[in-house]
């Protein structure tokens, strides 16, 4: 079954993550990690009258009038629908308990018609299944619940009202549609099943409700214990626990109040999203909930990139989420390759995720980020715990040098598209080596080692100015020795053959790529290799602004001729330029870009990866953790430079 690409809303608790569409359908549910495994193939809830012939009306399908909101300052989601054919108003409330492997779903139903209705509610559920890990189902009479189970996981759908009918397999979705389930088999090698409840007679104007609990465990006996405990608690108790948790969540962090409701709501939503995207068990940071399991449009998103995390952890620190930052760097220390570098991307459990090449900027960014966090918290014990990782990474970076150019060896760029020797990656390596040297100095490490790293950083900086600045235009080149066509011969005659690994394999590469790219801001912001007023930085930033601005919808494209997902302006690239303008003292220009990003947020105050180039509406990945991080960084930067009055006209 195909899934929508857009996750309109997310709920969770750091070990469970649920993704919900704008119509309220739960399309993805992860546990015990926020990236794996995903359990939901399909789940629908239907409403019907036993005493009429209207048929079953699916809550999340059809042309219902739908509204959706988060309960203020919580990750509790409410989706309301008007089911006109049944004269019902239904509100679905979804949340995950803060400290239990349980998702709660509550239906409030009101009869808005003039006639009685004998109300029935049916639920059909299909668990993920494959030939390696067969999904099976049973009806557990002890729990009065539908139970799905696989190799290392089981989960139950229990309720606060007794189940009237159930069915295992044999097209349970169709059975709910027909309003009659066949429970003659209570267990089977089938990934799907259904439940049906008799809600009784609902008079005009009357209300009723049904609470569902989706409880997870690694064993059936433990599942039964937990599910029974949850069933004994009322919905009001469960709701109250969750609401208090999220309301208290903000007390330990830095409050930022601008007086602009939309700006402040996005800030609050960003912090709550950060909590959901930070894995409770490991500390890994999820780039985004998955959108494309089938690799039909992209390389997938439900992984941890160290590059994104270096920006995200700075946003954590700006918001006072210091423990989340520290847990990430502890995770990074644990997953570091024995050679000293970090791979392209990881699962939350620390295993290497599907990848296609090292991206050396990520190793530099981790070192930069470790020192950056220390500058916020001044915790020397943190540096001591990180030292072994810092030392291995810095030593790797000074070995990873192209002897002919003096730049870091070819690796993939930050957009993961081109192999080459890139300006952004080079700046990240310089910043990383400088950070490692400073960390060593702070820890009293011998000057010989720290000076070796610092000398290497200075040498690479000289190579950057020599090799990666276009002498004709005075602009940064995006890359040299770069593979513009990964599938065949290069599209230019300005090429050279280079050896790509120690086994002697070689390929042709283009000598220079002069395309403008927002990452060319990187040598100044965030890495500080050059000051904002350095001649090449200033000229490149001006050219980027002129060439990459989207005249129709606003915002900044990633780079010239970007075609990914339609080629739209990105939140990250737009706010990156805003950060540069904050450094340069152009606070009003930065505020203008920030205003654009504020407009791009969804009605649930979530920020996408991109905004449509024609109408500026949020598109593609929602939410993107990196986008929210950049939002925090620009917001804080504007507050520091100009005060909250800068937001008066946003």
Model feature map: region roles:
Residues 255-267, 282, 316-329, 373-391, ...:
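Structural helix-adjacent loops and short alpha-helical linkers that scaffold large soluble proteins
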Residues 1-50, 301, 312, 347, ...:
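C-terminal capping/lid segments that line or modulate ligand- or cofactor-binding pockets
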Residues 288-298, 342-358, 403-421, 498-505, ...:
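Acidic/His metal-coordination segments adjacent to aromatic residues that form catalytic metal sites
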Residues 62-76, 256-297:
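Conserved oxyanion/phosphate-binding beta-strand-loop segments in alpha/beta enzyme cores
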Residues 158-165, 422-426, 451-572:
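Extended ligand-binding clefts on enzyme/binding-domain cores
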Residues 110-111, 301-404, 426, 430-433, ...:
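Aromatic-rich carbohydrate-recognition surfaces in CAZymes
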Residues 1-262, 318, 640, 644-648:
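Terminal accessory carbohydrate-recognition/targeting modules of carbohydrate-active enzymes
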Residues 257-283, 332, 336-341, 354-355, ...:
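Active-site acid/base region of carbohydrate-active enzymes
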């Amino acid at each position: 079954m195909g899934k929508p690409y857009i996750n309109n809303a997310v709920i969770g608790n750091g070990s469970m993550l649920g993704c919900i569409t704008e119509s309220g359908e739960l399309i993805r549910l992860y546990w015990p990690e926020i990236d794996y495994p995903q359990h939901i193939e399909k789940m629908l809830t239907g409403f019907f009258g036993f005493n009429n012939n209207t048929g079953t009306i699916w809550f999340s399908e059809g042309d219902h009038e739908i509204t959706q909101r988060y309960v203020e300052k919580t990750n509790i989601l409410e989706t309301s629908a008007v089911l006109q054919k049944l004269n019902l108003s239904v509100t679905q409330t979804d949340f995950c308990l803060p400290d239990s492997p349980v998702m709660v779903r509550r239906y409030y139903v009101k009869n808005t018609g003039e006639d009685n209705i004998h109300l029935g509610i049916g639920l059909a559920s299909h668990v993920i299944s494959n030939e390696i890990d067969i999904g099976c189902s049973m009806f557990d009479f002890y729990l009065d619940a539908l139970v799905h189970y696989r190799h290392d996981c089981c989960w139950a759908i229990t309720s606060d009202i007794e189940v009237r009918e159930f069915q295992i397999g044999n097209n349970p979705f169709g059975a709910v549609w027909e309003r009659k389930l066949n429970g003659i088999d209570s267990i089977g090698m089938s990934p799907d099943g259904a439940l049906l409840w008799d809600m009784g007679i609902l008079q005009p104007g009357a209300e009723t409700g049904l609470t569902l609990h989706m409880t997870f465990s690694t064993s059936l006996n433990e599942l039964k214990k937990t599910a029974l405990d949850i069933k004994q608690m009322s919905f009001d108790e469960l709701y109250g626990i969750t609401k208090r948790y999220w309301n208290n969540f903000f007390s330990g962090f830095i409050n930022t109040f601008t007086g602009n409701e939309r700006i402040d709501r996005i800030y609050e939503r960003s912090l709550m999203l950060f909590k959901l995207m930070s894995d409770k068990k490991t500390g890994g940071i999820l780039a985004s909930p998955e959108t494309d399991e089938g690799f039909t449009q992209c390389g997938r998103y439900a992984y941890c990139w160290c590059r994104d995390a270096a920006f995200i952890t700075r946003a954590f620190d700006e918001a006072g989420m210091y423990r989340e930052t520290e847990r990430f760097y502890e995770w990074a220390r644990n997953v570091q390759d024995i050679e000293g570098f970090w791979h392209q991307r990881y699962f939350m459990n620390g295993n290497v995720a599907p990848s296609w090449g090292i991206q050396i900027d990520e190793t530099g960014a981790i070192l930069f980020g470790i020192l950056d966090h220390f500058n916020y918290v001044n915790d020397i014990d943190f540096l001591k715990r990180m030292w072994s990782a810092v030392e291995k990474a810095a030593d790797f970076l000074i070995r990873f040098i192209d002897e002919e150019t003096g730049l870091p060896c070819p690796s993939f760029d930050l957009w993961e598209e081109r192999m080459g020797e890139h300006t952004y990656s080079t700046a990240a390596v310089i910043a990383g080596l400088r950070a490692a040297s400073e960390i060593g100095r702070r820890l009293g490490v011998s000057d010989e080692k720290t000076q070796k790293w610092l000398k290497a950083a200075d040498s690479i900086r000289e190579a950057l100015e020599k090799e990666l600045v276009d002498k004709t235009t005075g602009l940064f080149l995006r890359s040299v020795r770069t593979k513009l066509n990964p599938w065949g011969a290069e599209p230019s005659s300005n090429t050279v053959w280079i050896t790509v690994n120690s086994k002697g394999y070689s390929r042709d590469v283009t000598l220079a790529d002069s395309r403008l790219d927002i990452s060319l801001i990187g040598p100044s912001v965030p890495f500080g290799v050059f000051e904002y007023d350095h001649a090449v930085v200033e000229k490149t930033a001006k050219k980027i602004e002129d060439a990459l601005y989207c005249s129709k919808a606003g915002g900044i494209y990633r780079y010239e001729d970007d075609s990914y997902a339609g080629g739209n302006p990105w939140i990250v690239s737009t706010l990156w330029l805003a950060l540069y303008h904050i450094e340069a003292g152009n606070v009003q220009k930065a505020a203008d870009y920030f205003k654009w990003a504020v407009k791009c947020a969804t009605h649930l105050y979530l920020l996408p990866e991109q905004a449509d180039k024609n109408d500026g509406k949020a598109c593609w990945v929602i939410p993107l953790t990196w986008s929210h991080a950049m939002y925090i960084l620009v917001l804080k930067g504007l507050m520091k430079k100009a005060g909250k009055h800068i937001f008066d006209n946003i």
